[in-house]
């Protein structure tokens, strides 16, 4: 049987399948269910500074294609709407109970040194394995000068990453937005700032459909709608291309990559790993089919690696 253990920028896990920062990783109950199902790691739902934001409902939409609603998934979800201290306590408990699993904390705060160093100092005592800097969210938070508003400016990416690395020895993954002209420039900036790896892609800025009765983008809330983040199987080709661009670029070819975007089965994961990823993150498929899909992912990747004669993911 192949060895599926992985190391993404100094963050180790028993297999390469992590749950991405999203509703499935927003609380202790969900994360414990995920670990019992077999996931190798989680990226905790993005934390910010209190007071918490308010998430609206409904906040999800989908692309209709040949009778299938899940070709693409759209959301206007923001960061966590739970108090910071509650999240910190639960992260500490999860890591205590599951020491062999990767627990990475996603972070997003206003783009100033004081707030970034404040949030880093708050999470270091949780025992988490690393942090993921959310520079990718294209909606809601970007209008507040966070998320993709930072990730679209390489100078900001380098600056904030450096602030974080000056404040902690924890491994730091920089989550990149696909809503840029050249993903390589942003990856260069993440590396220059001291980032230990990159995670990509975050969601694609989108409007998936329009409610022709209310004349507003879907999903609508009280008759109003907005652009959101597009994910799911439809974005996989975009993600594969951007992962490949970074892994083959001479300046970043050895930079660890946590690949995200439309990964629904072991074959998708194998494709990203073949193109240079050290591990993968899953969200939409887990929301659609449930946490136990990781069983087939682990078995499928194991069987394929055995068949091809690969002993480790590095092979």
What is the role of each PLM region?
Residues 1-104, 108-113, 117, 297, ...:
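N-terminal capping/small domains of soluble enzymes
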Residues 52-69, 209-227, 285-310:
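C-terminal helical cap(s) of enzyme catalytic domains, especially alpha/beta-barrels
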Residues 259-262, 281-289:
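Helical hairpin unit composed of two closely spaced alpha helices linked by a short loop
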Residues 45-47, 135, 202, 284-285:
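Short secondary-structure boundary segments
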Residues 18-20, 103-106, 172-176, 258-259, ...:
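Short catalytic-loop micro-motif centered on adjacent basic/acidic residues
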Residues 311-315:
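Mid-to-C-terminal alpha-helical segments outside catalytic/metal-binding sites
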Residues 22-23, 261-263:
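Active-site metal-binding loops of divalent metal-dependent hydrolases
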Residues 32-37, 41, 110-258, 267-277:
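Alpha/beta enzyme core
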């Amino acid at each position: 049987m192949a060895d599926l253990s992985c190391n993404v920028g100094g963050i180790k896990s028993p297999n390469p399948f992590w749950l991405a920062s999203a509703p499935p990783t927003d609380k202790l109950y969900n994360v414990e269910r995920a670990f019992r199902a077999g996931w190798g790691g989680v990226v905790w739902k993005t934390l910010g500074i209190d007071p918490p934001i308010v998430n609206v409902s409904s906040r999800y939409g989908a692309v209709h294609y040949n009778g299938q609603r899940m070709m693409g998934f759209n959301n206007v979800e923001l960061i966590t709407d739970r108090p910071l201290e509650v999240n910190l306590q639960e992260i500490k408990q999860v890591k205590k109970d599951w020491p062999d699993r990767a627990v990475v904390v996603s972070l997003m705060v206003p783009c100033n040194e004081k707030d970034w160093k404040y949030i880093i100092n708050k999470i270091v005592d949780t025992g988490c394995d690393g942090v993921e800097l959310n520079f990718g969210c294209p909606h809601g938070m970007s209008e507040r000068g966070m998320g993709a508003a930072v990730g679209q400016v390489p100078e900001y990416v380098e600056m904030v990453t450096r602030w974080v690395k000056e404040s902690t020895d924890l491994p730091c993954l920089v989550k990149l937005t696909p809503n840029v002209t050249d993903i390589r420039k942003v990856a260069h900036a993440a590396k220059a700032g001291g980032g230990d790896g990159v995670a990509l892609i975050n969601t694609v800025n989108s409007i998936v459909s329009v409610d022709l009765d209310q004349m507003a983008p879907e999903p609508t809330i009280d008759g109003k709608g907005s652009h959101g983040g597009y994910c799911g199987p439809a974005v996989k080709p975009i993600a594969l291309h951007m992962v490949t661009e970074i892994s083959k670029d001479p300046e970043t070819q050895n930079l660890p990559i946590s690949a995200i975007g439309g990964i629904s089965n072991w074959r998708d994961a194998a494709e990203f790993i073949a193109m240079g990823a050290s591990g993968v993150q899953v969200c939409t498929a887990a929301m659609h089919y449930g946490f136990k899909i990781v069983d087939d992912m682990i078995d499928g990747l194991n069987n394929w690696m055995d068949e091809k004669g690969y002993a480790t993911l590095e092979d």
